Amino acid sequence: AMAAARRRLSVGLGLAGAACALVGGCLLLVGPVIIREQVIKNVRIDPSSISFSMWKDIPVPFYLSVHFFEVLNAEQVLLGEKPVLSQRGPYVYREYRYKTNITFHDNATVSFLEHRNLFFQPDLSNGTEEDYVVVPNIIMMGAAVMMEKLPRFLKYLVSKALEGLQQEAFMNRTVGEIMWGYEDRLIDTINTFVPGLIPFKGKFGLFMQFNNSNSGLFTVNTGMKNISQVHMVDSWNGLKKVNYWRSSECNMINGTSGEMWPPFMSPTSLEFYSPDACRSMKLVYEQSGKFKGVPTYRFVAPKTLFANGTDYPPNEGFCPCMQSGIQNVSTCRFNAPMFISHPHFYNADPSLVDAVEGLHPSREEHALFLDVHPMTGIPMNCSIKLQLNLYIKKVSGISQTGNIYPVVLPLLWFAESGSIEGPVLNEFYTNLVLIPSVLDYLQYIFLGLSVPLIISAAVLMVMNK
């Protein structure tokens, strides 16, 4: 009777072990497939997917923080001395992003307008929008450089007109005016003398195109046909490529619109088209990490992002170039001598930093980064940082430019930052981190259990003999 009980027990254990092995094996094979299917179903742009409402109205709180560079020695700069700068701010804005005119097309693409609305946050800022700062008179100094090649008599006329308008090389205006626009009779004067030189009327502000406006009509892939194409830009404002630059490679519209990427990312690089910089940008993988428990890949700007054509030949199309580390954006900024760079000329030619007083580039403060969840291609935490610079110099024939020594002068730098938090983070964590890892553990638990069960069964069988 003892032997029969043992036999029954060993058969039972053996069957239990086999069952565990079977379940574990199934999970091992099917688990990743189920997870993959779930991810695909939920990241494509489809009104029935989890991430659709998140894609439509981004629930992540975004902040725009702006630092101005005040010129402390404007009088001396006019005499040819080195500019001394003092960083003011940050002036922080809460940024709301949402999409309108969402239209699905037959070829698995969707088009939309992305809007940004900004609201000043006094409690997060160091100062108010009423603060006065001394900065270059952007329109006048920009126009002066643009008119350098014009006939002398025309420059003389402009110079006289500027005098009549009491225009000087530097201006003392409020943060609010410089950002959101100020009326300037100079705009009308330039439009009268040199029609078409500047394409705007009435008001001028550096961030006018940022607020209560959209960044152009994006048409992107929905991923319904091919998930590896999801979010990839098909066209921008109806264009398959832009024509700001001098090479077809530089004019290419690559990557996504900069909000999400295709899932199952490899730790190599990611690309997006930036309407603000008028070009595609490629960031490179730096390291893996975790953000609030969610695994992430960190992508950063390569040293070559704003390199000149000599140091990095593929960038030749963005020239005419100056030193490495600044990019001429005049072609997409109504031909004004504007340059973008990393803040404080981080990762740029040291001569740019040395040409002014008061810059302290550092990786911690001035490097941009994107932390993306590689399984879904959704960013968890990001901070995109850029600096706007104006090339100023003495322009003969325009007396207002004095004896200014040619310099790429930082005007301001800004960071657009956001990180996932609250209910959005919790839902994300549960569905895409917790459940997959539970499935992962279960397969090993079942497989792990099957071994002692089968061994026990075998031992009992042997003892029975």
What are these regions (language model features)?
Residues 2-295, 302-465:
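Extracellular or lumenal secretory-pathway regions
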